[in-house]
Curated annotation (Swiss-Prot):
Gene3D superfamilies from the UniProt entry: 3.30.70.1950
Pfam family, any one: MecA
Gene label: mecA
Domain notes: The N-terminal domain probably binds unfolded/aggregated proteins; the C-terminal domain interacts with ClpC.
Source organism of the structure: Streptococcus pneumoniae serotype 19F (strain G54)
Subunit structure: Homodimer.
InterPro entries given in the database record: MecA_C_sf, Neg-reg_MecA
Protein name from the UniProt record: Adapter protein MecA
Family note: Belongs to the MecA family.
Functional summary from the UniProt entry: Enables the recognition and targeting of unfolded and aggregated proteins to the ClpC protease or to other proteins involved in proteolysis.
One Gene Ontology molecular-function label: protein-macromolecule adaptor activity
PANTHER family hit by this protein: ADAPTER PROTEIN MECA (PTHR39161), ADAPTER PROTEIN MECA 1 (PTHR39161:SF1)
Disulfide bridges in this chain: none
Length: 245
């Protein structure tokens, strides 16, 4: 569970499904407003370290956005306290003016003062909706980028001599799916297919740097090698080269 302050009036609390289960809640509990849900919200606020600006607030509103693997709770503080204090409504006339007002005039003045206060709340809700929309767009973009990420990489290395190729092959200790050996324009080209799906993001660059200690990185594509190069080993080239000498 984590909390993020979005603005002076809004907090975002993110809870995993496990967080909910640990507290005896499930997503279905948020679909219908009930006393249990409200008690849960305030219990969470007590559990987290609240910013000072929220400690002495009046009313709090809660907005729940369920996700497949988590729940986002947006907490917005109101500038109007549940127990309305006329002293907080600075736009109200003083007592002498109040005494000269008719009941209708007083009600209209009171409604205007409250409307001015609630304007901030409406703006806060609109701002919150914009924040939610941006966060959803960002999450969707990240998911799309992740789905487009290729789980495999073909490394293509170039060698001037076969002896250099054998030396490199004997240094290979990382896991690979397969490897091929081609010859084209009097040079040897080794393709190595590596599964990077379960490795950290820096791994491909680190692996390439390690390979380049013994070989030249090539800008020739595998399709070019397949079409114009001579195939010397169509699979497990590295394993076969390791057996030499």
């Amino acid at each position: 569970m984590k909390m993020k302050q979005i603005s002076d009036t809004t907090l975002k609390i993110t809870m995993s499904l496990e967080d909910l289960m640990d507290r005896g809640m499930e997503i279905a509990d948020f679909l219908v407003p009930q006393e249990k849900t409200e008690e849960f919200f305030y219990a969470i606020l007590d559990e987290l370290e609240m910013p000072d600006s929220f400690l002495d607030t009046g009313m709090l509103s809660f907005r729940v956005t369920p996700k497949p693997d988590k729940v986002d709770v947006f907490v917005t503080k109101s500038k109007i306290d549940q127990n309305l204090d006329f002293e907080d409504l600075s736009d109200l006339p003083d007592m002498e003016e109040l005494a000269q007002m008719s009941p209708d005039e007083f009600i209209k003045t009171l409604e205007k003062s409250i409307a001015d206060k609630t304007k901030d709340d409406i703006e806060a809700i609109q701002s919150l909706e914009q924040v939610e929309a941006k966060e959803e767009e960002q999450e969707q973009a990240e998911q799309e980028a992740e789905s487009k990420k290729e789980p495999y990489i073909y490394y293509i290395l170039s060698f001037a001599k076969l002896a250099d190729l054998v030396v490199f092959a004997k240094t290979v200790t990382f896991e690979m799916e397969t490897s091929e050996l081609y010859k084209m324009n009097e040079r040897y080209y080794l393709t190595i297919l590596v599964d990077i799906e379960n490795h950290p993001s820096p791994y491909p660059a680190w692996l390439l740097a390690r390979m380049r200690e013994f070989a030249d990185d090539s800008d020739i594509s595998r399709s070019v090698l397949q079409e114009y190069g001579q195939v010397l080993m169509s699979h497990d080239a590295v394993l076969n080269l390791q057996k030499i000498g």
